[in-house]
Amino acid sequence: MRVCIVGASGKLGQHMVRLALDRGYEVVGVCREQSVVKLDAFEGRITVVPGATDERDVIERAVAGCDGVLVVLVPRGVHQYASGTAQAVLDYAPAGARLVFSCGWHITLDGQDVYSWKLKALVKIAGPIARLARFADLDDQVEACRRVFASDTRWTVVRGSDLEEGESQGLPVWSRHVGDPILQSNITRRVDFALFMVAALENDELIHQAPAIVGRQTPSSLAYATGP
């Protein structure tokens, strides 16, 4: 399988690169030119396409011939970075490719999610502040996911909880709606977020789903999980 990882130089991206290589995938990584050095550990093992992830010609070259595309949707700046990235992937990924996008719990597919007051306050207060500071635009990440949901591609949007570093606890558990009891712990190891993203490439049950994930060994997961 040939896989493109858009946003390969970040912490999540590097985990995905390593996990994809461990599975024997051919990997193409996209990252900003100034961040290419962060991928030096993989030199000779992956192809790197430098450039902003919302540059359409960069994405067009990177996804050519790929069976799957893993996309870190970063709401960077106030110039539609996330939606530009998503649109380029939707437009240029080969027909039939598996597309897996990462985002946070604040994204909703069907409006049935139930959010804690803390998360609602964070989005309501921090979002406008970040936008005023021209640092990030959460609304653009919402728009990016809206475009993904409306597309006829083979997409999955993985909604991550709060993240922590540490050794893998195994494949995270997931639920369709934030607010479900199994997600109550609201914490996932970053490496396991990456693991879920990579595993989703070959899990057709997740096509046209927006799974909200939580760590497999968290208290809520252990209390409510029914599967093996």
Which role fits each region the language model picked out?
Residues V30-Q34, A52-T53:
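N-terminal Rossmann-fold cofactor-binding loop
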Residues V3-R23:
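N-terminal Rossmann NAD(P)H-binding glycine-rich loop of SDR-like oxidoreductase domains
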Residues L109-D113, S151, E165-W174, A200-Q209:
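Glycine/proline-rich active-site loop of Rossmann-fold NAD(P)-dependent oxidoreductases
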Residues C145-G166:
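Conserved beta-loop-beta element that borders a ligand/cofactor-binding pocket
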Residues T47-C66:
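Conserved Rossmann-fold cofactor-binding substructure of NAD(P)-dependent oxidoreductases
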Residues W155, A200-A223:
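Core catalytic loop region at the nicotinamide-binding pocket of NAD(P)H-dependent oxidoreductases
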Residues G65, V69-T108, E143-A144:
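NAD(P)-cofactor binding segment of oxidoreductase domains
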Residues Y81-A82, D139-D140, Q184-V198, Q209:
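Substrate-positioning beta->alpha
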